Amino acid sequence: MDDEIQAVVIDNGSGMCKAGFAGDDAPRAVFPSIVGRPRHHGVMVGLSNKDSYVGDEAQAKRGVLTLKYPIEHGTVTNWDDMEKIWHHTYYNELRVAPEEHPVLLTEAPLNPKTNREKMTQIMFETFNVPAFHVSIQAVLSLYASGRTTGIVLDSGDGVTHTVPIYEGFSLPHAIQRLDLAGRDLTERLVLHLTERGYTFTTSAEKEVVRDIKERLCYVALDFDQELITAAQSSALEKNYELPDGQIITIGNERFRAPEVFFQPSFAGMESGGIADLVYTSIQRCDLDIRRELYGNIVMSGGTTMFPGISDRMQRELSNMAPANMKVKIVAPPERKYSVWIGGSILASLSTFQNMWCSKQEYDESGPGIVHRKCL
C-alpha cells in the first residue's frame, strides 16, 4: 500500500461517531450517531426537504424529526441508517472519496460474526474501499494508553464492557458485558429530576439532561456518607440554566444518577456493578497474568469521565482483590476518544500494513475473509 495515502479511521459508537485520518492525534469529525426523519411530511417545506438528516443536522432539527440511533448497545441494528452515517462521514465530514483510502472500523467485543461480515460487505460493495480492517474497540483503547497487556473498562453511550487483553489479543472467555451505560444514566437523571418536579419528555429535552449529566454529575467515594452530607447542607447543590432561561437546582441527583453504575440494583438490574465486572473478568483469566491485569486497569469511553470514578474504582477493587495485589487504575484525560486514537496509531504502523484485507482478497473469498484477517 502506498505510504502517501492516509487510512481513514472510523469509530462507530452507540452515541457518537468519531472519524478522521490515521496518524492524526485526534478525530477530525465527532458527531451524534443519529438519523432523523420528518415526523410529518409537508412540515419541512422550504427546507431542503430531504427524507433524512444525519448527525448534527438531525440534532439541530430534532424538534420536527423522529430521531433513531442505528447502533444500540454497541451493535448495529439498522444497516440502512448505518450506511447513511458512513455516507455522511465520507462525503460531508471528511470530504474524501472512500475508494481512495483504506478504512479501519471498530466494533464492540463479542460482536456477532454476521455483523462483522455485513460491515465488510457494505464497505467493499457500496463504498468500494481498496482495503479494510476491523478492530475491537477496547483493544484500541489499550494501544492508545501505550500498553499491550491490561484490562479495559470501556463504557460509552450504549454498552459497558470489561475486556482483558494479553499481548494485544483479547481473551473472549473472560469478557464481561453490562447493558448499562451513558444513555441509561441520562434516563436515571430524568427520573430523579422528575421527582424534583422538572419534566423532560421529548428527545430534544433529554439532550438537555445529557448536558446536565456531563457538566454536573460525579461519583461519590462513599455513597451513604455523601447522602448524609447532601441532606445536612446545600454545599453540593448546583444551578443549571435551561435553554429557555429557567434555572433549576440539582442536589444529591448529581451523584445518585451515576451510582447506578456501581449498584445496578438501583435500576432493578440483577447484575453487579462495574467494579464487580472488572473483578469477574480478571478471575476468569489465568492466575499467571492476574497481577499484570490488576496493575493495568484502563478506563475508556465517555461514561468513564465522571469526576471521582477512578478513586471509587480503586477503593472497591482494592477491597475485592487479594491482599498482596497492587491495583492501579489508569484514566487517560483523552479517554473519550481513546478508541479512535488507538485506531489512528494502529493503522499508521508499518507492521500493520500487511494486516489489511484487500479488495482483491474480498472478491476472491467473500465477506468471510474478515474472520481470517481481523482476529
Curated annotation (Swiss-Prot):
Q: Which PROSITE patterns match?
A: ACTINS_1, ACTINS_2, ACTINS_ACT_LIKE
**Catalytic reactions of this protein:** ATP + H2O = ADP + phosphate + H(+)
Gene Ontology MF term list: ATP binding; hydrolase activity
Cross-referenced Gene3D superfamilies: 3.30.420.40, Actin, Chain A, domain 4
Q: What class of enzyme is it?
A: hydrolase
- Where in the cell? Cytoplasm, Cytoskeleton
Keyword Nucleotide-binding carried by entry: yes
Keyword annotations for this protein, in alphabetical order, are: ATP-binding, Cytoplasm, Cytoskeleton, Hydrolase, Nucleotide-binding
Record bears the keyword Hydrolase: yes
| E.C. numbers | 3.6.4.-
Q: Name one GO cellular component term.
A: cytoplasm
Pfam families attached here? Actin
Q: What function does the entry list?
A: Actins are highly conserved proteins that are involved in various types of cell motility and are ubiquitously expressed in all eukaryotic cells.
Homology family = Belongs to the actin family.
The name of this protein is Actin-2
Q: Which organism is it from?
A: Schizophyllum commune
Q: Which gene encodes it?
A: ACT2
